[in-house]
A protein has these predicted regions:
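Active-site neighborhoods and metal-handling regions in enzymes and metal-associated proteins
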Residues: 1-257
Length: 257
């Protein structure tokens, strides 16, 4: 069942979204060669807790951290580690969920480490474009499949693949709520959007084959062929005449709002 949020609930989610954005601002300063993914998560946890939030990822099915930090061929759910140290040219995704007074916001950014090559630059550009091409359609009365198809077409027309096993999702009191939102679909299908729905839209794309593998830790998801991956996500609320993205940094708002 899709839970429609009240104005008060959305305000609390926006507070959580502001904290997620602050995490990106602070952690962006650490995105450079020689920094471990453990250090990035430690800074994120410091920001989340200092802002009066909790990080619901930590302890979720025994997951050990508040964030996922995934590098290059790791698509999602990279466990922060002292052993994973950033290098020049890497792509690093930081997936953050903050819970403020019982309500969540969820977003992911992929960062370029130092000078990156054309492959990294292009997959990041396409991943972001896929998100915005899909989200730009959101308004009351459309089908969720309209958004999914736009994301899929953007990704595949540029020569990439969308991950099939993992999806976006509804969000609110729960970190994961209905509906499930695959990054593929057909326009005119799926739930009809209404004002007050809150959705985590998150293209997860692969440079090579769509196949993935999960490591023995039970979490880390990698491209099976070892090629680059990219992940971009925001929490989006359906409003009267369209949508509002509630997890943007102030700099991002200048670009997208």
């Amino acid at each position: 069942m899709i839970i429609v949020k009240s104005p008060r609930e959305i305000e609390l989610m926006k507070k959580a979204g502001e904290v997620v954005a602050k995490v990106f601002d602070e952690c962006s300063k650490l995105m450079k060669p020689g920094v471990s993914t453990y250090e990035i998560n430690a800074k994120a946890e410091e920001v989340i807790t200092s802002c009066g939030c909790t990080g619901p990822c930590k302890g979720y099915y025994d997951y050990p951290a508040m964030t996922c930090v995934s590098v290059n061929d790791t698509l999602i759910h990279g466990i922060p580690s002292h052993k994973i140290v950033l290098r020049e040219g890497d792509l690093v995704s930081l997936d953050v969920v903050a819970n403020y007074h019982g309500y969540c916001a969820d977003a992911t950014r992929t960062f370029k480490i130092g000078i990156t090559g054309e492959r990294a630059n292009r997959i990041l550009e396409v991943c972001q474009k896929a998100f915005w091409n899909g989200v730009s359609l959101i308004k009351p009365g459309i089908h969720l499949g309209d958004v999914q198809e736009a994301i899929q077409k953007t990704v595949e027309s540029n020569g990439y693949n969308v991950a099939r096993e993992f999806t976006g999702h509804g969000i609110g009191k729960g970190m994961h709520e209905d509906p499930s939102i695959p990054n593929y679909g057909k326009a005119g299908n799926g739930p009809i959007l209404t004002k007050g729905m809150a959705l985590a839209i998150e293209p997860m794309i692969l440079e090579g084959r769509k196949d993935v593998r999960i490591l023995g830790d039970g979490w880390t998801v990698k491209s099976r062929d070892g090629k680059l991956t990219c992940h971009y996500e925001n929490t989006v609320v359906v409003i009267d005449d369209g949508y509002e993205v509630i997890t943007l940094t102030e700099e991002e708002k200048k670009l997208y709002v």
